[in-house]
Amino acid sequence: MKKLMAANWKMYKTPQEAALTAGELVKAVGTVPDDREVLVFPPFVGLAQVAQAFSGVAGFYCGAQNVYPADEGAYTGEISPGMIVSTGAAWALTGHSERRSVLGESSAFVGQKTAFCLEKGLNVVLCIGETLEEREGGQLEKVLRGQLSEGLSGVPAGIAPERLAIAYEPVWAIGTGKVAGTAEIAATHAVVRGMLRELLPAAADSMRILYGGSVKPDNAAAIISLDNVDGVLVGGASLQAESFSRIILA
């Protein structure tokens, strides 16, 4: 299975800046190693530009940071899977903790998005993760199981495993500079793999589980070498081509 090296650019970069960084990234990486794939989630307004920069370049893909589970309609401010596909993007991100906490998205709604995207031909990275209070309160497995079971509730049992990835992002490690220890990461990813075997047994062992949370060039190699870590989802360190290329090639 290829490691999925993903970047979430959040609400940064104009279309022009996104195109420039995407082009710089292609040059900095050169040929993507056979065991890697690169996936960038720019803001909506930069999707077409990043897709164009990656067009015809093996191993580079882009996706949307959000999606609405309908083909079209009176949903002001929202974007449909078809609109995303029309830009040249192939992926969508669902369940990110910032959308759960800041915008109040429930796990049930995340599940609707995930299932609808897969039905409409978009691949999905589904994010899960606990707060520090939940971890310290012994709620880690309960929280992750709830997010996974609802997030995957509409996913068909026969889903092709390469079309769906899980990103485990401990909320307390996102943008804080705090990183879960390698033992913590490995243990939690093993728990997630076990849950996937219960929920999607046919696909579970071939699905990629990414780690996210203050991933940087100097810790990426140690993280992606762990059992059940099949890539990373990178925030701040992905905004510059130089640093993200080092993570991709770590």
Curated annotation (Swiss-Prot):
Gene3D superfamilies: Aldolase class I (3.20.20.70). Keywords: Cytoplasm, Gluconeogenesis, Glycolysis, Isomerase. It is found in: Cytoplasm. Substrate binds at residues 8-10, 175, 214, 235-236. It comes from the Bacteria. It is an enzyme of class 5 (isomerase). The keyword DNA damage does not apply. It catalyses: D-glyceraldehyde 3-phosphate = dihydroxyacetone phosphate. One of its GO terms (biological process) is glycerol catabolic process. SUPFAM superfamilies: Triosephosphate isomerase (TIM). The active site is at 96 (electrophile), 169 (proton acceptor). One of its GO terms (molecular function) is triose-phosphate isomerase activity. One of its GO terms (cellular component) is cytosol. Coiled coil: none annotated. CDD domains: TIM. InterPro entries: Aldolase_TIM (IPR013785), TIM_sf (IPR035990), TrioseP_Isoase_bac/euk (IPR022896), Triosephosphate_isomerase (IPR000652), Triosephosphate_isomerase_AS (IPR020861). Its EC number is 5.3.1.1. Its main location: cytoplasm. Pathway: Carbohydrate biosynthesis; gluconeogenesis; Carbohydrate degradation; glycolysis; D-glyceraldehyde 3-phosphate from glycerone phosphate: step 1/1. Involved in the gluconeogenesis. Catalyzes stereospecifically the conversion of dihydroxyacetone phosphate (DHAP) to D-glyceraldehyde-3-phosphate (G3P). Homodimer. Belongs to the triosephosphate isomerase family. This is Triosephosphate isomerase. It comes from Oleidesulfovibrio alaskensis (strain ATCC BAA-1058 / DSM 17464 / G20).
